[in-house]
Amino acid sequence: PELSLTGYSLLDATSDVARRIDSPEIQTLIATTAEGKLDLVFGFVEESEEHILYNAAIYCSEGKIRHLHRKVYLPTYGMFDEGRLFGRGGSFRSFPTRFGRLGILICEDVWHPSASYLLAQDGAICLLALVNGPVKGIGKTGLGAQKAWHSLVAHETMIHGMYGVFANRVGTEDGATFFGASAIFDPFGQKIAEGERFTEQLLTVDLDLEHVRRARFQMPLLRDEDIDLTIRELQRIRRRRTGEGE
């Protein structure tokens, strides 16, 4: 899950629990993948060489870091205060693994459609969503948090024809309860595995990459996407917003 090494409600302790990539703690975790029997992704507070703190996640394999993602969208509303604690990441990029190209999003990132769009256009066949999702419902509708998150990830996997892994924490921290219910969705948006609510659990699931192929044949949205049109329209919108005209 998000910030899986530290917990979420860090406040003034954020700098105390931060670790550089070359720290013994991080290197020990990376070393567990050296034999090639497993790949590992985990969330932590990263301290950069410039001493900027990031809400970050590392994917490691065969004893090496394959990708570092720094959370881009930092919620600073309601119970969240990340904009005060962390620097903002600057990219959404897929990365190669022995299973194919993957992409990581951290919690609030998932709620921005452009994030998963960029990962899919960059070749990702699986979305890894690292989350600290509290029980509190979404908006005035009272939509349950679990239903909202599962619906969101299912939608993104379906429209992009890729797998989705939703990894959410459990437990209570500073009055906030996190519901767990981690789940895996196939490229058709169907839930194929789900963990229990409020209970730590290991899910072991085989993912058939043939389903990615089938999904993209049956609904070729990725093939038909017009990136150039999207870029042109975004440039036009930016000009209008900055007062430069259409």
Predicted regions and their residues:
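Short, conserved active-site loops that position catalytic residues or coordinate cofactors/metal ions
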Residues: 1-17, 129-132
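CN hydrolase (nitrilase-like) catalytic-core segments centered on the catalytic cysteine
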Residues: 21-41, 107-202
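Short beta-strand scaffold segments in enzyme catalytic cores
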Residues: 42-44, 55-59, 93, 182-184, ...
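Active-site beta-strand termini and strand-to-loop segments that position acidic
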Residues: 95-98, 186-187, 207
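A short C-terminal boundary segment appended to hydrolase-like catalytic domains
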Residues: 210-246
